[in-house]
């Protein structure tokens, strides 16, 4: 069964075979938001930052239960309980198809799933190298 968190969360999928010097990354803007469940209880904290190498999404959360959760960025800057449908459809400025593995290309808002272990804790970072917070097709627009 696939579960959905009413938040945007993103895991880092990276492997490293050799150590290389860290590159300097400039951070120009950081936005942080508390995450809440449908009943209003605290679920975690998410942040999104504009960096010189793209956008970084970070999350520290407590899932409702252990398991796999789908992650998505939504089109509207509104996320009201109890069903969170106010967030609108998945963010899709390039008009692609739904599904991370869609052969026609996935929505920009379709993100990798995340696993919550038995302790329900989720801590992740995910870099979106081709994204910007503002500007044409930016994540932030008039509705946030």
Q: Where are each of the predicted segments found?
A:
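Bacterial N-terminal signal peptides
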Residues: 6-15
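Positively charged n-region of N-terminal signal peptides that target proteins for export
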Residues: 1-4
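N-terminal leader/targeting pre-sequences
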Residues: 16-144
């Amino acid at each position: 069964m696939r579960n959905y968190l009413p938040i945007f969360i993103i895991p880092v999928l990276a492997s490293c075979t050799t150590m290389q010097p860290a590159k300097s990354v400039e951070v120009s803007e950081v936005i942080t938001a508390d995450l809440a469940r449908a009943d209003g209880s605290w679920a975690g904290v998410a942040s999104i930052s504009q960096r010189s190498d793209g956008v970084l999404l970070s999350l520290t959360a407590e899932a409702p239960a252990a398991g796999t959760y789908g992650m998505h960025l939504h089109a509207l800057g509104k996320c009201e309980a109890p069903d969170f449908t106010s967030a609108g459809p998945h963010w899709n400025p390039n008009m692609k198809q739904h599904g991370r593995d869609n052969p026609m290309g996935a929505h920009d808002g379709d993100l990798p799933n995340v696993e919550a272990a038995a302790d329900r804790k989720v801590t992740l970072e995910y870099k979106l190298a081709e994204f910007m917070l503002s500007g044409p097709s930016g994540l932030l627009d008039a509705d946030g």
